[in-house]
Amino acid sequence: MAERSQNLQDLFLNTVRKQKISLTIFLINGVKLTGVVTSFDNFCVLLRRDGHSQLVYKHAISTIMPGQPMQMFESEEAAS
């Protein structure tokens, strides 16, 4: 069965969600948010920290930095 193509944004967010990697999200207004992605869709990201959830609209996000190195592609395993 052919594998459905996934865009890079969805692949990245799904990887950090599954691996529960802590992120720092910088918004376009300069605000810095940290937490773990619990869910996302085409328009927003649900971020959880200290038992509280924040719904962040993607159009407000400037940069997302994972708190640790992450592997998104199987070929990265072989290269390491």
UniProtKB/Swiss-Prot annotation:
GO CC, alphabetical: cytosol
GO terms classed as biological process: regulation of DNA-templated transcription; regulation of RNA stability; regulation of translation, ncRNA-mediated
Superkingdom of origin: Bacteria
Molecular function via GO: RNA binding
All copies of domain Sm, residue ranges: 10-70
Family: Belongs to the Hfq family.
Free-text function comment from the UniProt entry: RNA chaperone that binds small regulatory RNA (sRNAs) and mRNAs to facilitate mRNA translational regulation in response to envelope stress, environmental stress and changes in metabolite concentrations. Also binds with high specificity to tRNAs.
The name this protein goes by in its record: RNA-binding protein Hfq
